[in-house]
Amino acid sequence: MAKKKAVNKRTSTSTPKLPAKKTVVRKSTKRSPAAVQSELKKLDREIVKLVNKRCAMTIKQIKSDPEPRKAMFDPKSDEELRENIEKFNASGPLTNNAVRGVFRQILSSARRQIHPQRVAYLGPAYSYTHLAALERFGEGADMVPVNTIGAVFEEVNRGNTEFGVVPIENSTDGRVVDTLDMFTRLPLRICGEVLIAIHHNLLARCERSQITEIYSKPQALSQCREWLARNMPQAHLHEVTSTSTAAQLAATKPGAAAVASHQASVEYDLQIIVEGIEDNANNVTRFAVIGEEVCDPTGSDRTAILVQIAHTAGSLADTLQIFKKNKVNLTWIESFP
């Protein structure tokens, strides 16, 4: 019988060779402060160059117009610019309002070099009407503060200023009676409008517990009446002609405070004791730009019509039928007085 050979099976204990490690060299993406500063300097140089080029082109455009003075206030062109900014600024990080602010100053400076526009507004400086005027005309315009809404109309009517800015309606308090009254007295026209979000602040130079008097214009006090009743019941409320006048008083009278804007706190060196005290967080005021001439249509306009009708039954209904017949929608109707 044949013998079977024994076969010993051994398990290999040798270690397999691993692939050689590759050394990866990563370049740092962090730039030195000096490199960043150098890049910023290049950008600043280019921005200044482009801003001046835009200003020069605006001057050239206005001067080439058959009516240069009229071209300086062109709502249609301004509307097109607003639409372009929203389209070009889709990626940010600047907000559309911030970019519009840059262009506003460019256009305002260009117009000033041709003819400084004079604009009357309900003052003093940094009232809400002043802020609305700056929003529309920029800092290149000559701003003329006056003490009353009626005085704004008079300045424009006498030719002392080309335009005026007045409040016409508030989302909380409704119509501004003084403005509507002046439209019945003087033959001026609405040339444009400015919408301003109104955020009231309690301003003072003393501690909150030391406030005994609060000043502001009637509309501002009305828009904060609930907050003031809850939080400042011990303080006496006083009506003045504007929020800026209130800020001036708060800056000079012991124990006095004002309901006014953030900008007023800076202008009159006041502390913001409480921010945003308006009862309605969506508090918006519509300001009218008034002048003597009718502006060209932009395609997205509002039209204001002042009519006087007979004091007879059905006269108002007959007037409204004209709008219905011509398929014109009405968004605001006021009976005055």
Which residues does each PLM region occupy?
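Domain-level signature for soluble enzymes in the chorismate/prephenate branch of the shikimate pathway
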Residues: 2-337
